[in-house]
Amino acid sequence: MPLTGLGLYGGHRGSRWLRNRIKVLKQFVVPSLQAQTNKNFTLWISVRQEDRHDKQVKALKEYFDSIREFETVFTYSGLCFWDDKLSDKVARDRLVTNLHGTIGELMNHIGGVSHVLMTIQPSDDCYKNGVVQGLQGVFREMPELQAVGFLKGYMMNYLTGELAEYNPVTIPPFFTIKFPKEVFIDPLKHLEYTGPYKSHEYIADKLKFGTIQERSFIVGCHGENVSTVFSHPYKGESVSREVLKDFGLKDVPNLKIKVSLRKWLLRKLPHKVQRKLRYVFGERFWNRIYEFLRA
């Protein structure tokens, strides 16, 4: 679980963003993890080195240390998958560096296993309660698979409680990669084993990929998302909140966070317009400044 964004400054988006993301994590994601029928997993939370002593991060670590249902490990070397917001060279160099720093921190938690299953767990999205059990079973029954993912799920407006189908036309970032242990713990082998895939849509081009058709994840929308909003084109039919009981979220209240006027106005625009404005005034502008300073 990356507790950071993508792009410049290691994905740092400010203390307000972090405060709101931690609130989402505690209110929605943690209950869905506690609801897993199989708790034989370790929640790996990756944080930037610069945030190791951040008050909010330290408080969050203490919070997870108090949870006994599953193990949690924090690492402080940044994002450990390909950052497609950066140029290929910068993304590759940064990923190798981050993996070098992270693997050492993870070694004591890996143990004497032959393989490591690494599941993408966003810090604001949720999995159905049988996902851990189901994924481990699929890899036992089909050992030739290198990755398994879900193609469809739900999306939820955490602010209003609205729930709908989520029907992407490409592979969404809800999959598990199976690494041989000796590959997982070697940064260069780790990178090459995954392709590297440069965005979740292309994971099946790099690894032998299996799919699960059952809707088993929730994409959370809360006003602080970088790209996914509740008016997304992949949004399908509205569904009953009854499905939330299978995610450990049946009685979860609506999220209450402060959203800036700028973001409130942005959410009122059509999805395509929102994406264009984010690119023009965000990613493209700051990328040019960043590349100029690096030159």
Feature-to-residue mapping (PLM):
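C-terminal catalytic/acceptor-binding lobe
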Residues: 176-295
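Conserved catalytic core of nucleotide-sugar-dependent glycosyltransferases
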Residues: 86-111, 119, 128-208, 212
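Well-ordered, non-membrane alpha-helical segments in soluble/globular domains
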Residues: 17-30, 57-59, 97-100, 133-134
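Active-site acidic Asp-centered loop
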Residues: 121-123
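Hydrophobic targeting segments
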Residues: 1, 13, 32-33, 41-46
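Short loop/turn segments at strand-loop or loop-helix junctions that form parts
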Residues: 1-11, 47-48, 75-79, 151, ...
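Active-site-proximal specificity loops/subdomain of glycosyltransferases
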Residues: 10-15, 49-117
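Short, acidic, metal-binding catalytic loop of nucleotide-sugar glycosyltransferases
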Residues: 17, 28-40, 62-67
